[in-house]
Structures are given as C-alpha cells and as structure tokens.
Amino acid sequence: MLYLAGSLLFGSGSARAQDPVPLPEKEEVVVDLFARNRTVPAVYVEAVRQQVLSAFADRGRHRIADGEAPGMLAGPPAGWGFVDPATVASVQSEFLQNRMQAMQDAGARYVVTGAIADYKFEHVSLPADSKKPSRPGFRATFQVILSAYDLKLGVPVPDQVYQLRGDAPVAEDADRKALSTLYGQLEYYIDRNFKFETAILQLAPADPRKGVQELYIHSGTYMGVKPGDLFMVYEEIPVGGVITRQKVGKLRVNDVGNSTVAKCKITKGNDEIADAFLAGRGLICVSDSKALFY
C-alpha cells in the first residue's frame, strides 16, 4: 500500500524530499472552430471537433474551453470555414493569428483548430470473412489536419495530419467508421505537443545491489497521470548567465495512488538522477510521449 489519507508512505532509509514545491497548474486549451472541405457535411467536422474536445478532457492535463461556447469569441471572419488540401495550411495559420491574442488575453495557454481538408469516397470489394463471402462495399477516406499555437511561448505547434479510412457495406457506415478511428490517436498528439512539468519529491529506498531504482514525482490523477506515462528528467544548469537544461534520465510511471503523487521506475540515468537529487541540484520532470512512431 503506497498511499494513506492522501499522503505518501515512505520506507525507512528513503532519501529525504527536496524543498516543498507547488503542484503543476492545469493550463487552458481552447479547442476553437474547425473548417471543412465543401464536400464534407458540417455534422462530420463537428464530430471531429468533439473528439478533440473529449480527448483533451479525458487526458486530464488541461482546463478545456470550447471555442463555440457562449461567451467565447465571436464567430469566424467573413468567408472563413471552407478549405481544400492546397489552402488548408495557410487558412489555419491565418485563423490562429487572428484569434490568438484574444485567447491569450482570456488566459489560455494553447488554442487548437482543425479541418477536414479532403474527403474521398470509392467503391471497393470487401474481403471475405468467416460469415460472408467477398462483396461490394464502400471506402471513405478523410484527411484531418490539427493546428495549434502555444500562446505562452509565441510559437506554433507542428501541424498533425491524419488519414482516416473506413470500409463498410453501407456508405454512411464507411464514413462513421473512418471518423471513429481518430480518437484513439489523439492521446499521442496531446502527449507530444502539450507537455507539463513537475518535480521529484523523493527517492525510494535504494536496492543494496542496484542502487536507486524508483522515485516519487509531484503529480498524480489531478494531472491525468496514469501507469505507463513517461517523463524525461532534466537538470537545470547555468551557462553564461542563462539557465539551460541537460537531459539526465527517463521515468516510467508504475503506480498512481492519489491526486498529487506517483511512483516511477527510473528507466535511464539512475545514478545521475540520484546524485543530482541528493546534492540538491535542480531537476525538472517533463511529460513525454509513449509513441515511438507517428
């Protein structure tokens, strides 16, 4: 049992925690309006936007604001809303530029927009399965592009392009099947581009032969931390009067028992992390993505 009454139980011989540090604060992400190709029904692009809203909410790392909610910004600029593969990048960039100052003034860290830039529909032969022989069907392919801007740093988030495909005997089912494949990919997008930072609270007792293998970080369910999440560990080092960060190791979350603390296995840099922590040198943990390829 790791947790009791919201507090971490430390075994004897464990390293003493560094000075108390505040919990990470949830920053606000505004999921703004989405555009579409003229061949795409409006209900489809709203379904995509709702998946993005749900993915951010389910990840649990940010405060989420709906750009279409009452009290948010007025509607889009005149003539905005339709894109194609050739124009989507410039249209999205211009849209973000027009909206980001107002979003920043309202306290947002990020603004996210998107578009269904292309839609293709074709007849295909569906493969045979255990119940039915090969038969005619339909294939729907959507090109979805997500664009975002980091308002704090003043830089764009790299665009993410998804090709969503679905096959089904009925045309509308092919559309729905294709669109439904987006949600499962969005956690990787969020983890890659919308990171947060936290601190190491304490080292776990050292193994007599292997040294320090585990530690505790100051983030739990409140920040959406779950087993399997990864963190990179950096040491902050002054260079010529400027604070720089040097990578010293990597963590994988093994156990999350409350809202503020998680136990992690050190997967890289055991000695470096332990030495820096015990010496009181500044260490920062930055959330990382589990995706190897994307």
What are these regions (language model features)?
Residues 109-166, 257:
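Amphipathic beta-strand/beta-sheet edge segments enriched in Tyr/Trp
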Residues 13-79, 163, 196-214, 287-294:
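A structural "domain/chain start" motif
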Residues 1-11:
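Bacterial N-terminal signal peptides
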Residues 31, 39-115, 156-159, 225-229, ...:
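N-terminal segment of the mature soluble domain
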Residues 238-262:
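Nucleotide-binding motor/catalytic cores of P-loop/tubulin-like NTPases across gene-expression machines
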Residues 18-26, 151-227, 232, 256-294:
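C-terminal/domain-edge helix-coil "capping" segments
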Residues 38-50, 90-93, 139, 143, ...:
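Soluble non-cytosolic domains of exported or imported proteins
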Residues 28-33, 51, 55, 111-117, ...:
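Soluble periplasmic/extracytoplasmic beta-strand elements of cell-envelope proteins
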